[in-house]
Amino acid sequence: MLIRPFSLRSASRPHQNIGRRGFLRATLGAVCAAVPAGRLWADAATPGVIPAQLPTVSLAGKPLTIAASDIKDLRAGLKGPLLLARDAGYDSARRLWNPAFDRHPALIARCAGAEDVARAVSFARAHGLLTAVRGGGHSLSGQSACDGGLMIDLQPMKDIQVDAKGRRAVAQGGVLLGELDRRTQAIGLATTMGTATDTGIAGLTLGGGMGRLMRIHGLSIDNLLSVNIVTADGKLRHASTTENPDLFWAVRGGGGNFGVVTDFEYRLHPFNHKMLSGFCIYPYSQARAVFAAVTELAAAAPDELMLAVALDSGDLVPKGGLSAGWLVDYCGQDPTVGEKLLEPLRKLGKPLMNTVSAVSYLAAQGAEGAANAAVPDPGSNAPNSYTKTGFFYSTPAALFDELVRRFEALPATVPSIAAMSQMGGAVARRSRTATAFWNRPALYDFLLSGTWTDRSLDQAHIQALRQAWAGIEKFTEGYYVNTEPGAEDKRLRATYGENFPRLVQMKNKYDPENLFRLNANIRPSA
């Protein structure tokens, strides 16, 4: 059976606020070189008029035309609007969180509900049409949109329903994590979500879902009770541990490979107290000492304590320059207990900056009083970036030495960050095969990223970051698909480990034609 609505309905409204973290972008090749990006379909229509033959792009990246009659039939069958390039609202609908990606879909289906999603998926499959799915539009690689294809846009689907007594929530696929946090925190409940309030719950959850509460309550997928999902055949299915359990296993960590999730049902936990959160920044000369102190403390830390260590070349220190620091989230009931746990880190000396304090969960998440903000216009001034990620299963001194040396060698013209965030706790206690998320035993999730706006420096900066990554990669195993969805097949296989063959079987069963391919793609074997 499908997830049924509760009697209590939310009054959530769309939010498009830009988070504090910098724009990140994984390298992604053009989907269709045969057609000039954005132009053919952008010029193909006048407002409100459907051309007799609409130029689009196929799944194979080749030119494809679709008859006006087919488009009219789709539009008539949708409750939400179907937008072409010159229709009112098209430009705002196609924009993503990262303005570096200036995609122009031929069609945008602004879905009003699961029935619209099913019709859009059936249309795409029938025509062999390149298809992108937008939940929150926060994809680091821009895969929430596509040039010349169909964008299935879940942004209008914002309903959130909370069962306070049963401690569960159902949220539609267009909800942002800040919206869900505010709704659940209003009654003193929470579940594991990410750390950027403008992230969509859909992509976050399907890739695993790391966040401040994961060491005590597990990943987002560990708190997922069921989903409603439209698979590639256009059917709306319910998936849980008792209904379509194979599909439910696959979507918990397998990303968007198996369909479009229209509803997520989460387990909620009591959380109505202050938590300890913030960071301390030190001179770069103390980088090795910071690494050593943090990893030593983390090795014996209770589940309530989560630590991270980061190298930064931005403007965190006076006059800019390199710095090293640690970040903390203590989710226990008493922040003073967290302060006592941090005493070994205080021995590092007086920091250049200290933001650690007792705050509400919403404040830590950046969702407290968050206001709407316009998504920036894409264009030539949009930033470029290079991002690589991986999991650390050990932290030898040689790793610290390599990180410090490689990071210091990066050009001063590319603001960069290298951060390793603690895992473990409830994440590691589940079996590696219980869900598709394989890297549960990892000690840390690592990210290296540089971002710049002078596009004339693209080649030099990417080369420098690649050289830095070349020295670090040997210490990693697999990667987090939500931060690097465009990685090569070899790394993808390492990411899913022994779960990969089973995921391929699920892909063969639920999406044998690889309709859902704009993701960390698990290709069908057929």
Predicted regions and their residues:
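Soluble FAD-dependent oxygen oxidases
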Residues: 2-526
